[in-house]
From Swiss-Prot:
Main location per the UniProt record: cytoplasm
UniProt name for this protein: Thioredoxin domain-containing protein 8
CDD domains: TRX_family (cd02947)
Record's miscellaneous remark: In vasectomized rats, autoantibodies against Txndc8 are present.
PROSITE patterns: THIOREDOXIN_1, THIOREDOXIN_2
Protein origin, superkingdom: Eukaryota
Gene label: Txndc8
Tissue: Testis-specific. Expressed in spermatozoa, sperm tail, elongated and round spermatids.
Native species: Rattus norvegicus (Rat)
Length: 127
């Protein structure tokens, strides 16, 4: 089941409740065609991977959370474990990595676009 997240509080509660499980968060918008296209597959993955938590954030109704996670494109998928964004465990193609600037900057895993095969591959790798 995909949990709808509407606030920073709900987001923090989800990450806290996940413990050591992988959390996959889709940042999307109702007007986004690719978001609509990938939604059924994302829902199906939430039923297939029961040991992974799936969540969805509407970027238009959750602007504080969208800014906090530095979302610039929809759909964007971010993955978390132990309440933190997952850092790459293996080499990733440059287009799949996002670099943050400023103090403490590091490479994090962030997947943009409606490519369900790549998303599922990363879920299997990070479980």
């Amino acid at each position: 089941m995909v949990q709808k997240i509407k606030s920073m509080r709900e987001f923090k509660e989800l990450l806290g409740a996940a413990g050591n499980r992988l959390v996959v968060v889709e940042f999307s918008a109702q007007w986004c065609g690719p978001c609509k296209m990938i939604a059924p597959a994302f829902q199906a993955m939430s039923l297939q991977y029961r040991n992974v938590m799936f969540a969805q954030v509407d970027v238009d109704s959750s602007q504080e959370l969208t800014e906090h996670c530095s979302i610039q494109v929809v759909p964007t998928f971010q993955m978390f474990k132990h309440s933190r964004k997952v850092t790459p465990f293996s080499r990733l193609k440059r287009i799949l990595c996002c670099f943050r600037s400023g103090p403490g900057s590091k490479k994090i895993f962030e997947f943009q676009g409606a490519d369900i095969e790549k998303l599922e591959e990363k879920i299997q790798e990070l479980m």
